From Swiss-Prot:
Keyword Nucleotide-binding in record: no
GO cellular component: transcription factor TFIID complex
Histone-fold domain location: 170-238
Organism (species): Kluyveromyces lactis (strain ATCC 8585 / CBS 2359 / DSM 70799 / NBRC 1267 / NRRL Y-1140 / WM37) (Yeast)
Biased composition (Low complexity): 81-90
Self-association state and partner proteins as the record states: The 1.2 MDa TFIID complex is composed of TATA binding protein (TBP) and the 14 TBP-associated factors.
Function: Functions as a component of the DNA-binding general transcription factor complex TFIID. Binding of TFIID to a promoter (with or without TATA element) is the initial step in pre-initiation complex (PIC) formation. TFIID plays a key role in the regulation of gene expression by RNA polymerase II through different activities such as transcription activator interaction, core promoter recognition and selectivity, TFIIA and TFIIB interaction, chromatin modification (histone acetylation by TAF1), facilitation of DNA opening and initiation of transcription.
Molecular-function annotations in GO: DNA binding; RNA polymerase II general transcription initiation factor activity
Span list, region Disordered: 1-121
InterPro entries: TAF4, TAF4_C
Primary gene name: TAF4
Subcellular locations according to the entry: Nucleus
One record GO biological process: transcription initiation at RNA polymerase II promoter
Descriptive protein name: Transcription initiation factor TFIID subunit 4
């Protein structure tokens, strides 16, 4: 603050302490003057002079007020710490401001639309050896060519002929329609004829595919257990084979020595012959005709046992035992698709297959 303009301080600086103590006294104490005899004309110190002469107080910059009322012994170290922390905080604030300004400038630069001159771009492409007009013409020609090829491919006639002849389909449909009192010529409607041919083809394809799958499953069963279930059956089979060979050798020796004659019994038939005979009998009963008579159906007739003749010099006793009970017969499964597979495939369909299934089971052979 400025000093009073009316009064000037002419005293030296070393007497400032005395002036502070006598600021509110009227008169001079050293001379023993009374208040009534004080001289107001002399320059007396004022309260404003003391405020000017005092040193200004240093306020903290950014430190929070302390709550510790005790005076610390080492007052120099806390002051250094506070000044260092305040300087670090100020540096961080300045860095944040600078970062914010840089990001703002970058965003502003990115938001600004980039103006590109087409002439400059074309000049750059020409310098690189690229002609824009030629490239555009080539692109348009290729697009037109692909469209033309696609249209021609869509208009092509299918390579394979129809499944059924259109004339036969038309006659069949005309006959069925006339039975329902609906008279129309289907020769002109080629789309309907093609649709009927395709539907018949899909129907037959489905039936044949299912029959093929059923035949494969019929011939190739699922192998649940690849190994043998028991070793006892294997041992018994080996014993039976050894007994059979020993018996055949014994019979051969007896026939060679003339002790036993080679005889065949007409009543003995193999299992294969009996199997065929039973199938023929079943087919004859299903057909319902008695036109053919077989020798094995009449009593007292002798059947030709070809299987026994091909066995060699084996006695009737060995043949009567059925080859010692060791002949294994596998299931007779026909290769390919048979009537059973077709009937099973048709059984899954519910419409228009009743008569076909009945006739099929009547004609089946096994």
């Amino acid at each position: 603050m400025a000093k009073s303009p009316k009064r000037k301080n002419s005293e030296p600086e070393d007497l400032s302490s005395n002036k502070r103590s006598k600021s509110f006294e009227f008169g001079k104490v050293e001379n023993g003057l009374e208040p009534s005899g004080s001289d107001f004309g002399s320059d007396l110190p004022t309260p404003f002079d003391t405020m000017v002469t005092e040193q200004p107080l240093a306020l903290p910059k950014a430190s929070s007020p302390t709550t510790n009322l005790a005076s610390p012994r080492n007052s120099s170290t806390p002051n250094l710490k506070t000044t260092s922390t305040t300087s670090k905080q100020s540096q961080k604030a300045e860095q944040k401001k600078n970062a914010g300004g840089s990001t703002g400038s970058t965003t502003a630069s990115t938001t600004k639309p980039q103006q590109s001159d087409p002439d400059k771009l074309s000049d750059a492409l020409l310098s690189a050896g690229v002609d824009i007009r030629e490239e555009e013409a080539l692109l348009s020609s290729t697009v037109a060519r692909t469209k033309a090829t696609g249209i021609s491919a869509n208009n092509q006639v299918p390579s394979h002929p129809p499944f059924l002849h259109p004339k036969n389909i038309s006659d069949f449909m005309k006959r069925i329609a006339s039975e329902q009192n609906f008279h129309q010529d289907f020769n002109k409607n080629t789309d309907i004829l093609g649709l009927m041919s395709t539907a018949c083809e899909l129907y037959m394809r489905d039936v044949i595919t299912n029959s093929l799958i059923l035949s494969i499953h019929r011939r190739k069963g699922v192998k649940l257990n690849t190994g043998r279930r028991s070793e006892v059956s294997r041992s018994l089979r080996d014993l039976a084979l050894r007994q059979k060979t020993q018996e055949e050798r014994r019979v051969q020796r007896r026939i060679a020595l003339g002790l036993e004659k080679q005889t065949t019994d007409a009543r003995l038939d193999t299992e294969e012959t009996q199997y065929r005979a039973s199938n023929a009998t079943a087919n004859l009963m299903i057909a319902g005709g008695n036109k053919k008579k077989y020798s094995w159906l009449t009593a007292g007739s002798k059947s030709s046992s070809t299987d026994l003749k091909n066995q060699g010099n084996v006695s009737s006793a060995v043949a009567a035992r059925g080859e010692m009970g060791i002949k294994y017969r596998e299931a007779r499964e026909e290769p390919g698709i048979v009537m059973r597979d077709l009937l099973l495939a048709l059984e899954n369909r519910r419409v228009g297959v009743n008569n076909v299934i009945t006739k099929g089971y009547a004609r089946i052979r096994d």
